[in-house]
Amino acid sequence: MNATILVKIITPLSIALEKQAKMVTMSGEEGMFGVLPSHVPMIVSLKAGLVQVYIDDMHKSENTYLISGGVTEVTANYINIATETAINVTNLSEVEIATKLLDLQKTLSDQH
């Protein structure tokens, strides 16, 4: 399968990521889900967690972002992820990512 889908992670301050991908996984309010090219259109609320973008290999995430929750719009050709915060954690260890996630969740709970 050589098809790709355009994925954008958008924050109020910038476009954190804009790439063609073979697959994207993320945390919805009802659990983790993945999106492939030609996916049925949908709009989904996202929880704070990881967005994993698979560029060349569908078995290894090549770009990983920690987001503060938000909303995603999916069509057959693109995925737009709107979030307040997007942190590139691609090169961090699992322990560092877990620490950043806990920090982000604490910040979000302090705001509410």
Swiss-Prot record:
Question: What is a single molecular function from GO for this protein?
Answer: ATP binding
List the Gene3D superfamilies hit by this protein, alphabetically: F0F1 ATP synthase delta/epsilon subunit, N-terminal
Keyword terms, alphabetized: ATP synthesis, Cell inner membrane, Cell membrane, CF(1), Hydrogen ion transport, Ion transport, Membrane, Transport
Q: Where in the cell is it found?
A: Cell inner membrane
Q: Taking the first listed entry, what is the main subcellular location of this protein, grouped into a coarse class? A: membrane
Quaternary structure, from the entry: F-type ATPases have 2 components, CF(1) - the catalytic core - and CF(0) - the membrane proton channel. CF(1) has five subunits: alpha(3), beta(3), gamma(1), delta(1), epsilon(1). CF(0) has three main subunits: a, b and c.
Q: What does this protein do?
A: Produces ATP from ADP in the presence of a proton gradient across the membrane.
- PANTHER family the UniProt entry points to: ATP SYNTHASE DELTA/EPSILON CHAIN (PTHR13822), ATP SYNTHASE EPSILON CHAIN, CHLOROPLASTIC (PTHR13822:SF10)
Name the UniProt record assigns to this protein: ATP synthase epsilon chain
